[in-house]
Amino acid sequence: MSSVFDEYEQLLAAQTRPNGAHGGGEKGSTLKVDVPVFTLNSDDPEDRWNFAVFCLRIAVSEDANKPLRQGALISLLCSHSQVMRNHVALAGKQNEATLAVLEIDGFANGMPQFNNRSGVSEERAQRFAMIAGSLPRACSNGTPFVTAGAEDDAPEDITDTLERILSIQAQVWVTVAKAMTAYETADESETRRINKYMQQGRVQKKYILYPVCRSTIQLTIRQSLAVRIFLVSELKRGRNTAGGTSTYYNLVGDVDSYIRNTGLTAFFLTLKYGINTKTSALALSSLSGDIQKMKQLMRLYRMKGDNAPYMTLLGDSDQMSFAPAEYAQLYSFAMGMASVLDKGTGKYQFARDFMSTSFWRLGVEYAQAQGSSINEDMAAELKLTPAARRGLAAAAQRVSEETSSIDMPTQQVGVLTGLSEGGSQALQGGSNRSQGQPEAGDGETQFLDLMRAVANSMREAPNSAQGTPQSGPPPTPGPSQDNDTDWGY
């Protein structure tokens, strides 16, 4: 029978092989889109700033078509480069689009001066300027920046220009994090991360973009695979760049921590709390199929290479193999473990229709039972004596019991139900508590009595200040309308 199991394992390996591994797919069968990309041949600080603003305006313009927005966004992300043409050439290494490089020598009164090699006529240059002037209506001050007049302020030197450009690029990179996942709920996280970069000095408050501009840029990223391929290449370069050597790629590497493995949270949480905890529940025959599936998925992830963390951003079809429905029982068990061991998972909505309630409860039971267990490998490395192990286990057990006796309804395990027994008892008062917790109930009763006494004293204070209690309702704030002297006669 061993041959049957070997064949089954090979079958799973064949099913989880990455798409395109055989090399028989067609290339170049799809029509390529011509994407115009702008480059600047000048290192003048003012020209470089005008170029960045020009690309930003086109990227969020209402009159620009999709290829023009995509090219302007790529140009904006390359505006820090000393030789922009070489940087743009990296974006052209793809089969999705053809990049048409349009060289700009400088700007005169806000008008781009195109190089003769670009073949851009004067009429087309004026059309580009008109498109750049068509901003969304939400930009009330006529600029993409919340601060009016920010783009008209000439930079002092190249350092000032780079700081401004980096402020814009940081906001663009922040929108990438949730561009392919929960983009409808990205406002809060984007604001939080932009505030973080403002505190670090990477983003200047003066050059904060309107939210509608960030939403437009995020929509362009969602719609264009060519832009996302360029973004992934920049993320890879940021990871390969040594820290502290490039201001721009230090920022890209920092943003990479938010983008890596997006859409694969369920897979990695299952590995962390379902596999890495090494509980005895993994010996259940009902979990053997899911464990075998996880083994093949880990192998698939390694075979994807450098693109594995960015499967969601690239829209890779192999990402569907990592969906938690493929290993539902092990996922349910891991989420039960995580709900007890890691309170941070409370923000992750891991409840699914296919979740097994029994395995989730099993995970909760194992997590609670292992709260006072000792990792033998770590204990051996620390050279703990038997007495030290017993003392550590007793201390952990005592702390877990004390923690469980405290009523904390917001941290109770109630993901599937939304309620907890401790929370309902807290609403009913200390008299309805279980008999096993008399001290906690008495403490809560004393606290409620104290709060009632404070409230009564606060209500009695105004009456004592007036000398006699009021027999009627309290007066209405403001001048009395029943007094003739207050009518102005």
UniProtKB/Swiss-Prot annotation:
InterPro entries named in the record: Paramyx_ncap
Main location, first listed in the record: virion
Annotated region described as Disordered, given as residue ranges: 421-489
Comp. bias (Polar residues): 422-437
Ncore as annotated region, ranges: 1-402
Location of the region described as Ntail in the Swiss-Prot/TrEMBL record: 403-489
GO annotation terms (biological process): negative stranded viral RNA transcription
Gene Ontology MF terms: RNA binding; structural molecule activity
Superkingdom classification of source: Viruses
Pfam families membership: Paramyxo_ncap
Keywords: Capsid protein, Helical capsid protein, Host cytoplasm, Ribonucleoprotein, RNA-binding, Viral nucleoprotein, Virion
Location(s), subcellular: Virion; Host cytoplasm
Domain notes: Ncore is globular and carries the regions required for self-assembly and RNA-binding. Ntail is an intrinsically disordered monomeric domain in the C-terminus.
Subunit structure: Homomultimer; forms the nucleocapsid. Binds to the viral genomic RNA. N0 interacts with the phosphoprotein (via N-terminus); this interaction allows P to chaperon N0 to avoid N polymerization before encapsidation. Interacts as N-RNA template with the phosphoprotein (via C-terminus); this interaction positions the polymerase on the template.
Known function: Forms the helical nucleocapsid (NC) in a ratio of 1 N per 6 ribonucleotides, protecting the genome from nucleases. The encapsidated genomic RNA serves as template for transcription and replication; encapsidation by N is coupled to RNA synthesis. Forms the encapsidation complex with the phosphoprotein protein P. Before encapsidation, the newly synthesized free N protein, so-called N0, is chaperoned by P.
Family designation: Belongs to the paramyxoviruses nucleocapsid family.
Protein name per its UniProtKB record: Nucleoprotein
Natural source organism: Avian paramyxovirus 1
Organism phylogeny: Viruses, Riboviria, Orthornavirae, Negarnaviricota, Haploviricotina
Gene responsible for this protein: N
